[in-house]
Design a protein with these regions (language model features):
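Alpha-helical transmembrane bundles and membrane-interface segments of multipass inner-membrane proteins
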Residues: 1-175
Length: 175
């Protein structure tokens, strides 16, 4: 469907809207830290907005609207990949809630930031490859590399947060 000229504008708009939202999130975080405007509400709402943006993007791209005539996904995504991404977000959000409820801030770490950046590149890249870019082999290979890199970094990020939370979880489970 994406090759039809009447749909190309949708691909352009969707990818640019996602990029503007992702860059806006980065700029807002930078300004909040730079001007010492970090609040408890912001520590909750910013990760929530990140989840909506990223998980929403991946879930939508997994939808049946992005299947070919045989019912195969044209996005390069598989259901298990999106489950890994969404599952990681739910797990880390739960750990963040647990930590914040205990009075301990739960800031993003290096792997969490790398994950957000790569996911924020992967979603619009996938969107752009729904149009004429499908005919350019290196763009499709780059899409697949980005998808697999996203999955790898998502898992590494989950493991890093679990490792950092291990002591607090063990302490809480004992008493």
């Amino acid at each position: 469907w994406a090759h039809r000229s009447e749909h190309l504008w949708l691909i352009n708009w969707a990818s640019w809207i996602f990029i503007v939202c992702a860059v806006g999130d980065i700029v807002a975080g930078y300004l909040a830290r730079r001007h010492n405007l970090i609040t408890s509400l912001g520590r909750v709402l910013d990760p929530f907005a990140d989840k909506i943006l990223v998980c929403g993007g991946f879930v939508i791209l997994l939808g049946t609207g992005f299947n070919d005539a045989e019912g195969r996904s044209v996005t390069g995504l598989e259901a298990w990949m999106v489950l890994v991404i969404v599952g990681r977000e739910l797990l880390i959000s739960s750990l963040r809630g647990f930590s914040e409820a205990s009075g301990k801030p739960y800031a993003a770490n290096y792997w969490g930031k790398v994950k957000m950046v790569i996911q924020s590149v992967t979603v619009p890249w996938i969107i752009r490859t729904l149009g004429p870019a499908r005919e350019v082999p290196w763009l499709m290979t780059a899409r697949d590399v980005l998808i697999w890199s996203t999955i790898l970094v998502t898992v590494l990020s989950a493991l890093s947060y679990l490792s950092a939370s291990r002591a607090a979880l063990l302490e809480k489970s004992r008493g």
